[in-house]
UniProtKB/Swiss-Prot annotation:
Mode of membrane association: Multi-pass membrane protein
Organism: Sordaria araneosa (Pleurage araneosa)
Keywords, sorted A to Z: Antibiotic biosynthesis, Glycoprotein, Heme, Iron, Membrane, Metal-binding, Monooxygenase, Oxidoreductase, Transmembrane, Transmembrane helix
Family annotation (Gene3D superfamilies): Cytochrome P450
Binding residues for heme: 483
GO CC terms: membrane
Involved pathway(s): Antibiotic biosynthesis
Name by which UniProt lists this protein: Cytochrome P450 monooxygenase sdnH
Family: Belongs to the cytochrome P450 family.
Cofactor(s), by name: heme
Record localization: Membrane
Disulfide bonds: none
InterPro entries found in the cross-reference section: Cyt_P450, Cyt_P450_E_grp-IV, Cyt_P450_sf, Cytochrome_P450_monoxygenase
First-listed, main subcellular location of the protein, grouped into a coarse class: membrane
């Protein structure tokens, strides 16, 4: 009876409540007050009671991610600021912990708390502890949201699910299979070389950035779906593709901190996305391209059961695999297509843009490269040499390594050890904590790379090569989640540069109206991007 009377009394009170008696200002004030109290409690917890409280670093970063969002969206230079944070808090770390650590004048201070939930370590020797193979420990990630790629291999949070999704493609994207399939790269090389020959002497600058982006887009299209979109054969090498990919990259900092923008735009019709958020339209185009080709491949695989010979592509492999049927639905494969087309196109093209600029800008580098390519490219008119032969040209290898180093994979990359605590310098990092390292700081460490901002291929050719150089160079990351497309990226870079800069061809390239600022990466959009008003890489074919 007591309980019934309480309910009756409550019902009577509720009946007396009228919306007319509610003051909107009081409601707004109550909500604001509750949010303020919650925020204060959250900050106090993060600064005083969080498991990462004892790690060095700025209190502002430990309290909130809003500062990083501000820097990413306004100044685009958080990696440089992170380097300064290491320099400042490293002195305290070394003094308090009494640990002797090799220090560089710029990147000192090996461990800092870089967000409320994340630890950043600036020590290349710790790289393979964090980016571990499955034999060492399992690794999760914090997946990006808002890109429409949440179900792709690269964005899969769980270690076990990542391995399940990746296993069918490890063989397809492995070095042996790329070597076996490199005839498709040779075919595109012929298209590229013939196009350059046809442009000789017309006096019109060629956008090499568009050339490289279209080349890599065609190769990725063939690998993914067995069919090239023929971007390289489009008018002026399809500059719309380059503009779309670069435009999509510009929205990444927004989606990094406000993924809801991407999630909302994915539900909008195409015309509305183009009108309201034009930079995100690039992701929509990638999704549409992927959806159309997946439907075609799905039909081909179905026909194989009727005795019709099918093609060979990433999606043929996935649809033929023993993956659960839930992993073969179009929505997930479309996420894979979007991720593969984006990640497989621009980073490789950006490296080619960067390396080609420095070769064209320095006659000594170009002359030496041509001389060293003389033998391996001698029979190019009859046969495009294999990637394995071209990569033996040490100076070309040095140019590509230097380009990958300077391209500056800006964004720090984090891994989460799910099963074990990690120990570094007297600190125990609890399992489940995101721990990140920055290829940027490893690639730009002046102790390892003197004059780190300069393009110096010869640094890789000295007899007493510092072993730390190869240790620090990690453009494709490492461990069980390393870049699945790195072998095709290497093959394209070697063969394209060898073709364009081989001696005794019937055309030459001359740098057009552009300078270093048009190619040098200064914006942190996951990978380094040149200034937004860049003129691109222009060259005359003479």
């Amino acid at each position: 009876m007591a309980l019934a009377s309480i309910f009756a009394e409550f019902k009577g009170l509720a009946a007396g409540v009228s919306l007319d008696n509610i003051n909107p200002l009081y409601v707004a004030g109550g909500i604001l007050g509750a949010f303020t109290v919650y925020s204060i409690i959250l900050v106090v917890y993060r600064l005083r009671f969080h498991p990462l409280t004892g790690f060095p670093g700025p209190k502002l970063l430990a309290a909130t991610t809003w500062y990083e969002a501000y820097v990413d969206l306004i100044h685009h230079d958080f990696p440089e600021r992170l380097a300064k944070i290491h320099e400042k808090y490293g002195r305290d770390f070394l003094t308090i912990k009494l640990i002797v650590v090799p220090r560089s004048p710029r990147f000192s201070g090996p461990i800092v708390r870089v967000s409320p939930h994340e630890i950043h370590v600036n020590d290349a020797e710790f790289f393979h502890t964090v980016f571990a193979t499955e034999a060492k420990h399992r690794t999760n990630i914090i997946p990006p949201r808002g890109l429409g790629q949440e179900d792709s291999i690269g964005s899969t949070r769980s270690h076990d699910m990542h391995q399940l999704r990746r296993k069918p493609l490890d063989k397809f994207m492995g070095q042996r299979n790329i070597v076996r399939q490199q005839s498709m790269i040779h075919e595109e090389i012929r298209v590229l070389d013939q196009a350059m020959t046809s442009l000789k002497g017309n006096g019109k600058p060629v956008r090499l950035d568009c050339v490289f982006t279209s080349f890599t887009g065609d190769i990725v299209g063939r690998l993914a779906c067995g069919e090239a979109p023929q971007l390289l054969q489009g008018k002026d090498f399809t500059p719309e593709w380059y503009d779309m990919i670069r435009g999509a990259a510009r929205i990444i900092p927004v989606l990094r901190h406000f993924p809801q923008v991407g999630e909302i735009t994915q539900k909008m019709p195409n015309w509305l996305v183009q009108a309201l958020v034009p930079r995100s339209a690039g992701f929509r185009v990638l999704q549409m391209l992927g959806a159309e080709r997946i439907a075609r491949v799905r039909a081909e695989v179905a026909d194989e059961k009727k005795g019709v010979e099918g093609g060979e592509s990433m999606f043929h492999y996935l649809l033929r695999s023993d993956l659960p049927e839930s992993e073969k639905i179009s929505a997930r494969l479309n996420a894979e297509a979007t991720s593969f087309m984006g990640a497989g196109t621009y980073p490789t093209a950006a490296t080619l843009i960067f390396v080609a600029y420095y070769i064209l800008a320095d006659p000594k580098i170009e002359a030496r490269l041509k001389n060293d390519l003389k033998d391996v490219m001698a029979n190019f008119d009859d046969e495009v040499p294999n990637w394995e032969k071209v990569e033996q040209v040490e100076y070309l290898q040095a140019c590509i390594k230097e380009g990958l180093r300077l391209l500056r994979l800006f964004r720090r990359k984090a891994r989460i050890a799910t099963d074990i605590d990690l120990t570094y310098g007297g600190y125990v990092i609890p399992k489940g904590t995101p721990v990140s390292l920055s290829p940027y700081t490893m690639h730009m460490d002046p102790d390892v790379f003197p004059e780190p901002t300069k393009f110096k291929p010869e640094r890789w050719l000295v007899e007493d090569l510092d072993p730390r150089m190869n240790r620090n160079l990690n453009p494709f990351l490492a461990g069980s989640r390393n870049c699945i497309g790195m072998h095709v990226a290497w093959a394209q870079m070697y063969l394209i540069l060898a073709t364009l800069f081989r001696p005794n061809k019937n055309y030459s390239l001359k740098l057009g109206e552009c300078d270093e600022s048009d190619v040098y990466p200064v914006v942190d959009n996951e990978f380094g991007v040149a200034k937004y008003d860049s003129r691109g890489l222009n060259a005359l074919v003479v």
